[in-house]
Amino acid sequence: MTPLAQQLEQQLQRTLATATITAQSLPDVDDLALYLLNPDYPRTPMSSEQMQAIWQEPAYWIFCWASGLAMAKWLRENPDYVRGKRVLDFGAGSGVVAIAAKQAGAVEVVACDIDPLALLACKANAELNGVELSYSQNFYQLTE
């Protein structure tokens, strides 16, 4: 696990003390992997304190959302839509769409998310996949 991934896991453990992340391949997008919540994470009842902590700092980036996976697969099948272009992944989460766009030939991809841990996840996942992304926490500060 890379230093970025270790940092990401440590941040996750502030909310979910026993949670770990692992590099996982994605279905139907063979050459893309993400650091996601370990699939065997305990599914036992949580205390009210744990639930409150999760509500206050939801870690949306620990899952690959179906819409992101579908978009990544679509970009694989239709790279001409992003090849040679500048792309914004708004609400990037784990960065799956940003990474897929970069792999499909986008000149620059900006992963934008208000959650600093999501941006850390994007950085760790970009590193895992050997791509370079740009990052922004504020859409309004992006320049053309």
Q: What does each model-found stretch correspond to?
A:
Residues 1-43:
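N-terminal auxiliary segments of SAM/dcSAM-dependent transferases
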Residues 73-141:
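Conserved SAM/SAH cofactor-binding pocket of Class I
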Residues 42-46, 98-100:
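Short acidic/His/Gly/Ser-rich catalytic and metal-binding motifs that mark active-site loops
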Residues 48-57:
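Glycine/charged-rich beta-loop-alpha catalytic/anionic-binding loops adjacent to active sites
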Residues 144:
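Short SAM/SAH-binding signature in class I
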Residues 58-76:
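Conserved SAM-binding loop and adjacent beta-strand
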